[in-house]
Amino acid sequence: MPRRLFPISLVLLLLLLALAAFPAFPAWAFSLTGEENTLSQIRGLLDLAAGSIRPGLDLRPDTPIEHADVNPYGINTFLHQEVEPAKREKQVQLLAEAGFHWLRQEFPWYDIEISGKGNFEDCRFPPCHPAWDKYDQIVDLTEAHGLEIIARLSSPPSWTRADGDARGPFAPPDNFADYADYAAAVAERYKGRIRYYQLWNEPNIYPEWGEQAVNPESYTELLCAGYAAIKKVDPEAVVLAGALAP
């Protein structure tokens, strides 16, 4: 949380704690946050208040673009969660037959650089093997079926945070340079095979930025670090900001 917002947030917290004693508070807070638990309601109201006092976005006017003559149909996939390669192949085949062209496929950091920085071996279930193996197969399958991947780079391993998973498994790493190095490793391995990368997922909602308030300033810092790292190893790559929740 930016330092300038801390005193304001503290005052708001005290006010909300006082309001919570009134009988009408739960219904009012639920209407704004959708939460039923009192502490969750207070946290949601604090997030709303913090968002309302942040500087507004400085956006350029919309620029009309020509229609791109490409297949517009895509789907979220989690092919890495399928244990059996044959079933993974069948899923990709069905997606191609259904008319999809774009697969927004996660390349979760915790499943690639698993136990420490620079270690791309998976030893969770001996014998050890390269953590890249399943992702290599996913890329092979999409190419074989004429599909394209939008690689979602998210979900840090616990070693990237001094407090482990205390702030939740989706909390950002302590050092954004570690994220940049992971993003660069993925982009370098699949240079010329994956063109599109999306950095993080829904960083504007809880708990996608961890068990803490969302922080657009910090996310922007992470986005810039990842962008620079990917473009350095693959100048032709297209780097996308994380998809935002409505």
Indicate residue ranges for each PLM-predicted region.
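N-terminal Sec-pathway targeting helices
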Residues: 1-14
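Generic N-terminal simple sequence motifs
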Residues: 3, 19-22, 231
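A generic alpha-helix propensity feature with a strong bias for hydrophobic helices
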Residues: 10, 26-29, 111, 175
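Sequence-pattern detector for short linear motifs
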Residues: 6-7, 91, 107, 155
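Generic serine detector
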Residues: 9, 23, 31, 40, ...
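Substrate-binding cleft and catalytic face of glycoside hydrolase catalytic domains
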Residues: 98-121, 125-246
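Hydrophobic alpha-helical membrane-insertion segments, chiefly the h-region
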Residues: 15-27
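N-terminal carbohydrate-binding accessory modules
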Residues: 26-102, 117-119, 125, 140-144, ...
